[in-house]
Amino acid sequence: MERAEQQLRLFQRVSRLMTRDLELDDVLQEIVSLVKDFLTCDSCLIYLVEDGELVLFASSDQNRKTIGTVRLRLSEGLTGWVARERRLLAISREAYSDPRFKYFKDLPQDTFEAFLSVPIISQNKVVGVINVQHREPRLHTGAEMEMLSTVGEQIGCLLVLSRQKQQAPTSVG
């Protein structure tokens, strides 16, 4: 299957997840799995803004005890930089040596070489960040950057739908 077809299939799967009656945590967890498979990356993480901090909400890593416990200010780390600057960040090698890098003892981030991150924007506000990481150096393509940006936009829409669902009266049927 052509890469463009695979990308379209990924977007369709994310869109279908958005329409299912699932908890937000479950949808985000499924999205990190889909992105990890598509990009053949070693790690995919989704952080959401909560009380002015970025909180880890979904992780493709085996150690899920870090979900909800890893928190960083918008001024911290590569992830905080992406949120603060509202810009994509792609580092092809030695991401751990970037001066913006922040080490977390509970995350194996210092073992990753390549890093790709995009802000999640909803209603013109940064509401989170999605990161992918590779253990080996990797120059991300423009298509990969665009794909992750689009998934970030879909997550932004998902968060709007999730808020509406919480506020809406229950319907029959």
Give the residues covered by each predicted segment.
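Signal-transmission linkers at sensory-effector interfaces
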Residues: 1-25, 37, 127, 161-173
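Helix-loop-beta substructure at the N-terminus of cytosolic sensory domains
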Residues: 20-57, 66, 76, 162
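Acidic/proline- and glycine-rich, intrinsically disordered low-complexity segments
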Residues: 51, 65-89
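Short beta-strand-to-loop transition segments that serve as allosteric relay/switch motifs
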Residues: 62, 129-138
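Signal-transducing coupling segments at domain and membrane junctions
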Residues: 65, 92-114, 134
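A short, aliphatic-rich beta-strand micro-motif
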Residues: 113-121
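Allosteric cytosolic regulatory segments
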Residues: 149-156
